[in-house]
Amino acid sequence: QVKYNKTEILNLDMEFLHEGYPKLNLKTSFPKIKKEKKKIIKKSSLIDKLHKLLSSPNIVSKEFIATQYDHEVQATSIIKPLQGEGRVFGNATAIKPLFDDEKSIALSQAAYPQYAETNPYDMAGCSIDTAYKNLIVSGANSKKIAILDNFCWCSSDEPDRLYQLKEAAKACYDYAVAYQTPFISGKDSMFNDFKGFDKTGKSVKISIPPTLLISSIGVVDKISHLTKITPDDGDILLVLGNTRNELQDSVYSKIIGYEKSKNPVVNSKDALRTYRNFEKANKLGIINSAIGIDLGGIGIAVTKMAIASKKGLTIDLS
């Protein structure tokens, strides 16, 4: 019931508001997956490949964008978006809302629209895993992490697009349960499709790729648990976790080429075991710096650490 100047202007039954709209009967169909033509791996040096990866739009620095708004959150930032002398984006940011409290709040996010057409379930799984991992790597307590979803989708009236949406939502449930991270909020932006005409008058339709952005927020119990991406002289660099033949739809495969591969699949049990061990080591104070491996793989991750700290690294992957 809504009144204005004591005059009733709206009286809507709550049962009707929540239950009055009839349920829709919608159909889904498995989408036709366009097989990407196999790219021939070009013979080039590791340096050339690294330069191509670093200059790709999804990896190159976005500093010119971030610094245009209040990216330091009213002077409460303790881990800022850009880290080190080289000013490189880290995995997460952290703010300290209360001056006299050791706790801080870490925030991160992840999105992998490039995987959506191949496997929307795994796309959502990768997004949740990365958003979660970024907070763990930054020092957050694994038992105090929550996530938010932001679905940016094309027309769900189309059975194949609705199927992709259903698969992504299913993954949200499965991985939120596996990681014990509740969805505390979210938003949907549907029907992002353009219908019009080209310069010849022919009708065209352009749809955005199915996209799911996962944001994560977590509590860091002590400031001493916060990590940085800038190693110090003499630090030993270790790689945690396993690498599998999962280069399909990766930045590397798009730019440089690939042999037969598949898209990344998150094994939550293996991942959580790695994250728990990292968290234990960090609480013991033996982690000086850390970075989560993301777009571009190990090569980009260690390069970010080197640029941020302006130090050289000796790497052995044998």
Which sequence ranges carry the predicted segments?
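Glycine/proline-enriched, intrinsically flexible loops and inter-domain linkers
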Residues: 1-318
